């Protein structure tokens, strides 16, 4: 076994791809059912009315309406407010 690394060899040179997390639909924006609202690790935002949570903590719309961000009992929540017809 060589105890010196060969020429132009390195132990570095790796980097992971970005995860593209964050808010995808902002407050007041109209959405349809199934649209992704927030991609996150952990529950930075909690699901509110009309919002579901996936296995990777992604929040998505369960119904069509407008996105609304707010707080409930000290937690940040995302709600879907039905649009007036």
Curated annotation (Swiss-Prot):
Ranges for region Disordered: 1-22
A GO term, aspect molecular function: structural constituent of ribosome
Gene Ontology cellular component terms for the protein in this record: cytosolic large ribosomal subunit
Coiled coil feature spans: none
Keywords, in A-Z order: Ribonucleoprotein, Ribosomal protein
Alphabetized Pfam families for the sequence: Ribosomal_L27
Polar residues composition-biased segments: 7-19
GO biological process: translation
SUPFAM superfamilies the UniProt entry points to: Ribosomal L27 protein-like
UniProt xrefs under InterPro entries: Ribosomal_bL27, Ribosomal_bL27_CS
Domain of life: Bacteria
PANTHER family, alphabetized: LARGE RIBOSOMAL SUBUNIT PROTEIN BL27M (PTHR15893:SF0), RIBOSOMAL PROTEIN L27 (PTHR15893)
Family recorded in the similarity comment: Belongs to the bacterial ribosomal protein bL27 family.
Protein name per its UniProtKB record: Large ribosomal subunit protein bL27
Organism: Streptomyces griseus subsp. griseus (strain JCM 4626 / CBS 651.72 / NBRC 13350 / KCC S-0626 / ISP 5235)
Organism phylogeny: Bacteria, Bacillati, Actinomycetota, Actinomycetes, Kitasatosporales
Gene: rpmA
């Amino acid at each position: 076994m060589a105890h010196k690394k060969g020429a132009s060899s390195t132990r570095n040179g790796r980097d992971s791809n970005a995860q593209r997390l964050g808010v995808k639909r902002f407050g007041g924006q109209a959405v349809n059912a199934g649209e992704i609202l927030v991609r996150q690790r952990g529950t930075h935002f909690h699901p509110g009315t009309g919002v579901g949570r996936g296995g990777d903590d992604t929040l998505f719309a369960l119904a069509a309406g407008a996105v609304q961000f707010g707080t409930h009992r000290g937690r940040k929540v995302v709600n879907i407010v039905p649009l007036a017809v």
